[in-house]
Design a protein with these regions (language model features):
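Proline-centered loop/turn at the N-terminus of a beta-strand
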Residues: 93, 147, 172-174
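Conserved hydrophobic/aromatic pocket- or pore-lining residues that grip, position, or stack substrates
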Residues: 96, 148, 165
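Conserved Radical SAM active-site core
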Residues: 1-145, 155-157
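Long, well-ordered alpha-helical scaffolding segments within enzyme catalytic domains
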Residues: 78-86, 163-170, 175
Length: 179
């Protein structure tokens, strides 16, 4: 995606220490130069999707901590499901960091309707109430418990990404300056 990916800690973790963990296996490999590179494969770890709904004590959750929720290979349906959980677990604060704020800016308009259409008619999501899902109400959207950020590695990346971040509906926006 950018120069900021050259020494990615997440790729290094996935290619070394986490390479035998089923949720990370095959997502990154070491190349001939000894650099960790993602393979381009994306994976939806559905077994953990409802975990925030089960946690009672409020937490700060880094969504897709070792990946990018707005990667081009991540289907909108996966993102819809993740946002539905965030809507249903408003006691937690969810932080999303992306190098692709242009996709977030294009994706987020209409999110409330998509989630409501998919889940709003349901009283429960699995065993959990979806009391946080409201249809296009100013009080609920953007979700007050979701922070959206972009990572930037230099001024050019900041100039390219920050305008998309600022144009994206979010309760809290942030910038992560990374080498």
């Amino acid at each position: 995606v950018s120069e900021g990916c050259r020494h990615c800690y997440a790729a290094t973790l996935a290619a070394t220490r986490l390479k035998n963990i089923p949720s990370r296996a095959g997502l990154a490999r070491m190349n001939a130069a000894g650099e960790a590179k993602f393979t381009g494969e994306v994976r939806f770890n559905e077994q953990w999707l409802d975990q925030p709904l089960r946690w009672r004590k409020p937490r700060r959750i880094f969504v897709c901590a070792h990946s990018d929720l707005f990667h081009k290979a991540v289907p909108d349906e996966w993102i819809d499901r993740i946002f539905a959980v965030m809507a249903g677990a408003q006691r937690h604060t969810f932080q999303i960091l992306t190098k692709r704020p242009e996709r977030a800016a294009a994706y987020l308009p209409g999110l409330a309707s998509r989630i409501y259409d998919a889940y709003g008619g349901m009283e429960r999501f699995g065993d959990y109430h979806l009391d946080g899902i409201a249809h296009d109400t100013a009080e609920a959207w953007p979700l007050p418990n979701v922070w959206l950020g972009t990572s930037v590695e230099d001024q050019a990346a900041a100039d390219a990404r920050i305008p998309y971040l600022l144009a994206t509906p979010a309760a809290v926006r942030f910038v992560s300056a990374e080498p």
